[in-house]
Amino acid sequence: MTRRFVHLLVFLLLLDVCTSARAQQAAQRRSPGFDVEEATIERIQQAILKKQITTQGVVEAYLRRIQAYNGTCVNEPQGILGPITPIARAGQINALSTLNLRPRARAAWGFDARKARSMTDMVDEARNMPDSLETAAAQDQQFAKTGRLVGPLHGVVLAIKDQYDTFDMRTTSGADADYANDRPPDDATFVRRLRDAGAIILAKANLAEYAVDGARSSFGGTFCNPYDTEREPGMSSAGSATAVAANLVTCAIGEETVVSIRWPAAVNSLVGLAPTQELVSRDGMMGAGLNMRVGPMCRTVQDAARVLDAFAGYDPKDEMTVFSVNRKPSQPYASFAVEKRLDGVRIGVLREYMSRKLFAQADEESIGLIERAVADLRKLGATIVDPGAAGELFTRCIARYAPELANSAFARQYPKLFPTDVSAQAGADQIATLLQLREDPSRVPPELTLRTLNAGGFGATGEGKYWINRYLSERGDANIKSNADLITRARFYQDPNFPDRKQAREQAERATALDTSVRLQGRFAVQTVLLQCMQEQRLDALVSPMSTIPPRKLTAPREPAVNGRTPIGWSLIGQQGFPVITVPAGFARSIWDRVAEGNGTRLVGPVSAALPVGVDFIARPFDEPMLFRIASAYEAATRHRRPPPDFGPLPARR
């Protein structure tokens, strides 16, 4: 259903819009035979078709849960911009920063003004911007006339990460900045496609400001892990993840540059898909870059596939999506997410990411859960290619191909092999050295593995400033026109336990050139090496941990990097454009926490816990069908997803 058609229906309904009293009565309705908690897309649509609930009733059911669970989850003695302290079992998560409700409906539901659709248009009466309840009412009216759903996502209630443009809701990437109009002029392409498929955009999700690190933004505040509100909920897309985990929405849309879809999904017992980068448009994304991609976060593999079906494909506004032309399957992605067996599928085990000898006590239990996942895949009929607990799947293959393909990065990584003079010019014949290594890969340093393949640096310069300025130029706001304006016309939180956002913007501003050549070379090198390694072993997919580190306490020190393992999980393969899906793999029951001690830190434990762990499945670019086959079979056999116990069903209202 197009936006224009929705607007027409909403206009016809305006005379009959609920008053505040009637809206409150609607909020108290509970439809027999349907519960929104853990409801899948199929379950929601079947309930609508069977007239167990209306689309408006679905939205209201989620709003009741938002009322109950979306409050502040930390102590803020100096206000939203000051230092925070965690609250044990807070019963709140602060996942959603903006609600798609007109002022009258927002007041009737008891939400404060900071959750308004716009802070620059507090009247908010434009008829071409129906709110979520009005859109739902329009769907109900259309369904009453035709008996058919308006589209494949009819009744599906979504949250969108605040990094993405929504024409009817404020978009600031978590910043408390002085936009003349905090609403962008149009939807991001993928948001428009979701609406056209019938999805109802209920909220903008809180995020780490400007989609960097940490569970905090200057406008939205701190958000928390629903499985332990004293802990971080993942990376920048964690507001999206926690909203889905606590059943505040059906699914949400995240963004991933490093692990920002997969890590929040893993620690919130969700399915998170970081698709092939060129498959989904990045149009309307604040701060897009070469490694950024759009993906769904849902409670089931099938739901993630249905959302991908709605927005995947070429978009002339994002030239990278040209690579997706003729690369989508002829049948829907959702049709692949129905497997029960994996006979004939060859899956390689990335033991490089699972070594008990190389990592720390903090990694132990998660490694055990991934080993159990490998055993489950074998039971499902998959052919498991496993180098063994002490082995590494790709190290020999990497030694053959990486030095030549990564050349300059490889030379920087091993200066003893490739000495330079004081002017950084080659001090010896590097070509001769590379040829020798090609002829005899045993001479390649043994520490060159999948863990260290990018240690020579695959970075870019100027991206942070370039992409923000490009986005703001296209947005055309009268006040905020550049990264420099974001520095001078915004307020920033100040807390030593979280990254300094103003400092990050100032650092980005110092760039005067855009250079992505090294990143592009690294991307080509990693893709070529891994595709060749997979082909040599006839692998359809790979399995690995998403992360082996439990989420830390919100104000605790980070676990230090060890042998290539970072405190936020394994990111190399996904960063280079391979599609990766994270699926719940169980719960860590006994963990180790990093705490400050004097001028350093130490591990304490074991600590009793019940924290979700995720397993990653990785496929070749554009082979999402293989991912959905493996993930759906594993999900069906294991059913590890559990909702957070402190965010259960609400009491029935009389």
Cite the ranges covered by each PLM segment.
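Short glycine/serine-rich loop/turn segments
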Residues: 87-90, 99-119, 126, 130, ...
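Acyltransferase
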Residues: 59, 137, 187, 332, ...
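Short, surface-exposed loop/helix-turn segments at secondary-structure junctions
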Residues: 404, 551-567, 592-600
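Short, well-ordered alpha-helical
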Residues: 25-172, 176-180, 210-212, 321-330, ...
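Short helix-loop capping/hinge segments that flank enzyme active sites or metal/cofactor-binding pockets
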Residues: 31-32, 107-119, 154-176, 335-356, ...
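Boundary at the C-terminal end of the N-terminal hydrophobic targeting segment
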Residues: 21-23
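Structural helix-boundary/capping segments
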Residues: 68, 196, 245-359, 367-383, ...
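Bacterial N-terminal signal peptides
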Residues: 7-17
